[in-house]
Amino acid sequence: MKRIAIVLGLAAVVMSCARKDWRDASLTAEERASLLLKEMTLEEKVGQMCQYVAPCYVEPGKGSARKNIDATDENLGNKDLSDKVRRGEVGAFLHVMTSTEAVALQKLAQESRLGIPLLLGIDAIHGNALIEGCTVYPTNINMASTFNPELMEKIGEETALEMRQRGLFWTFAPNLDIARDARWGRMGETFGEDALLTSEMGKYAIWGFQGRDGKYSGNHVVACAKHLIAGGEPAGGLNAAPMDISERKLRELYLPPFVAAIRDAKVGTVMAAHNEINGIPCHGNKWLLNDLLRDELGFDGFVVSDWMDIERLHSMHYWVPDSTEAFVVSVESGIDMHMQGDKYFEAVVAAVKSGRIPESRIDQAAGKILAVKFALGLFEQPVPEIPEVLDGAAEHRQTALEAARQGLVLLKNDGTLPLKNPRRVFVVGPNADSQTILGDWAVPQSDDNVITVLDGFKAAMPNVSIDTLCFGGKISNVDAKGIQMARFKASAADVNIVVVGENSQRYSAFGRTCGENCDRDDLSLPGMQQQLLEAVVASGKPTVVVLMTGRALSIGWAKENANAILNAWEPGQMGGQAIAEVLTGQVNPSGKLPVTVPRNVGQVQTVYNYKHSQYSRLFATNETGALWPFGYGLSYSTFEYSDATLSKSEIGVSESLKASVTVTNNGPYDGDDVVQLYIRDEYGSVTRPVKELKAFRRISLKNGESTKVEFDITPEMLQCWGVSEKWSVEPGDFTILLGSSSSDSDLTPLPLKVK
């Protein structure tokens, strides 16, 4: 009887397993994906690995109307996309820029044999800003200037909600590149030059997009950590240029943000980088995409290519003889999804049938893509319900405003700010009344969805006479005649607000000077803006510079001659209000630089965490060193740092300790400051940087208030990638530095001995 019971029990288990169906929502996403794979043909599996740009993105007239920088690329006009979707040969689309198209594409996918929904993605880099009417938050470089990861998480949550409400479920964000060359046009997409700051901001952004559990439930979407790896310090500052780096530099500088994204935030997807590292293009680098990413870091999601970068293994890198070989090598190396273009599908199917690519590799890639779709709930509701009005739009605008306020960096102030009841204000410059305030990765918005600097001043100073000269929002319109007019108007004002900088708008008809594939060999103000600034200063009236840019600009003349400088970066749709509030004293500035500002283009790459020998020699014809240091930013208040102490002066290699410092706001205003902790390893088996940021905390203090700020210092904060080619804490002398910026003059050093 006992034996019969066991047999019957086993039979019940077998029958139960046999009844399992991929439509059963009680199963895990991975279980459902595995079951669905068994019902799919090879062609349907490879179809999941194919992503195309949305048809409406490139329909006749649209590309030229938007001035789309990608519209001239090959393979955009896929005539038979509808048939491909019906055959199950498309797994995803990107740049679905209307909810109408999102619904139509998902309905089309339901006509396929298995009705597998599409994964619709978009570059929601700083808000769902490629969709008109959605919230355009400050760019990532602005957000890094806040040193406020929790605010970054909130923006991620709100962006995810707005994406869901427009039928989108996958954002190609955050950008985790470490930006160490201001010539590179994509600095504004990043969180700056530091590994820790980028790691924290990126991790919290992913938590916002995906949820803390990494399951994309509710109103969350799947995020994408990009670009793997080391594209932020390209040769010559040119996007996609080669990188030759040591494994030590890769692990200590470029990899930590991805480690945090994968191990802490459980990011669902990773995008490979345009560039090569050490002679191997990232899209064909098996060590990078498999040995490091999956085996060592434990990444369990899927890897997507960047825009047609698989083809560029042949056409740009000249690494393989043709695109067919590029497609096959990319799959062998670990790329799971191809972003945009024809011929990939046919090449991969043929490679499997010939035996070159095992079908198990296709199952791995398609299975991971399907698991994400199941986790997102797409199979339960493949066709999204689109609300007429975005939920939370007013609240999201307030978040965008607060982010803009916190990200503004005051670089200079001789007492001119905050403005003291002027009667006549002259607002001048091509960025004063322009949507350049939105930055890259944003479509033109309706005027009522954007507050420009001029709009902000009109609202903040309703009883003040405001004169303007905005040059039609075009940098190229600044000419000798306009400059002469500006000097005349400046002479009649009590104070002049000069809004200059760059233009990152990819869909603008005006000349771009910054953004993706817009790199420069000059870090001065483009066009005749420098002459404009000099003419206004020559009026003899107080002059405030508002710098609107996606990269660090070398404005040494302005530093010497302007009365005040506010680095606004690209603060988004509410930026004009935030700028006006700061300049008029309604808000106390509190942003800190997430990059080092070089003195001139000849001094890139200037970074704060350089090696001791970098400045053992000085430039012969100019001052050596940063124009402004990393972590720097002024306030209208004076913050005093005192009583910096360590809980221990000597520890073992596996021990932790605490560091603390008292911060006092000596007024005269309430304000925020960012307390920064740096560590210097004085001597080691390999040479070490002069300092490295290891912790930070944003604090708010009332006028006259004090607080004690305490940090835990763990062994992980003391370790390095030594000659043994592994992480370890090396015994010896360390210095803990506490203060308000990376400048030695703003830091208190505390010695620490590690035994």
State the predicted function of each range.
Residues 1-20:
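Bacterial Sec-dependent N-terminal signal peptides
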Residues 17-721, 730-744, 753-755:
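Glycoside hydrolase catalytic-domain context in secreted enzymes
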